[in-house]
Amino acid sequence: MSIENLLSSVSLDTLLVIGGYVALGGLYLVVMPLLLFFWMNWRWHVMGKIERFSVYGLVFFFFPGMIVFAPFLNLRLSGQGEV
């Protein structure tokens, strides 16, 4: 069974729903966690109390995506420690 036959047998509504789920899943697991990581790296030492509290809430909300990228991103200051 080819992919064209498979896609033609599925209704357009079903394909739209699947596409919506894939888009939301990608937004939740990839796009927002990366944006949040870069935002934290950029603003970490100048954040106010309310901004830091809201960032902690977003980290909690996007935790599944954050844990995927955590081993690859480093938020430490450059120039710290001996090389």
From Swiss-Prot:
Pfam families: NdhL. The keyword Signal does not apply. It is an enzyme of class 7 (translocase). Its EC number is 7.1.1.-. It is a multi-pass membrane protein. Keywords: Membrane, NAD, NADP, Plastoquinone, Quinone, Thylakoid, Translocase, Transmembrane, Transmembrane helix, Transport. It catalyses: a plastoquinone + NADH + (n+1) H(+)(in) = a plastoquinol + NAD(+) + n H(+)(out); a plastoquinone + NADPH + (n+1) H(+)(in) = a plastoquinol + NADP(+) + n H(+)(out). The chain crosses the membrane at residues 18-38, 53-73. GO terms for cellular component: plasma membrane-derived thylakoid membrane. Its main location: membrane. GO terms for molecular function: oxidoreductase activity, acting on NAD(P)H, quinone or similar compound as acceptor; quinone binding. NDH-1 shuttles electrons from an unknown electron donor, via FMN and iron-sulfur (Fe-S) centers, to quinones in the respiratory and/or the photosynthetic chain. The immediate electron acceptor for the enzyme in this species is believed to be plastoquinone. Couples the redox reaction to proton translocation, and thus conserves the redox energy in a proton gradient. Cyanobacterial NDH-1 also plays a role in inorganic carbon-concentration. NDH-1 can be composed of about 15 different subunits; different subcomplexes with different compositions have been identified which probably have different functions. Belongs to the complex I NdhL subunit family. This is NAD(P)H-quinone oxidoreductase subunit L. It comes from Synechococcus sp. (strain CC9311).
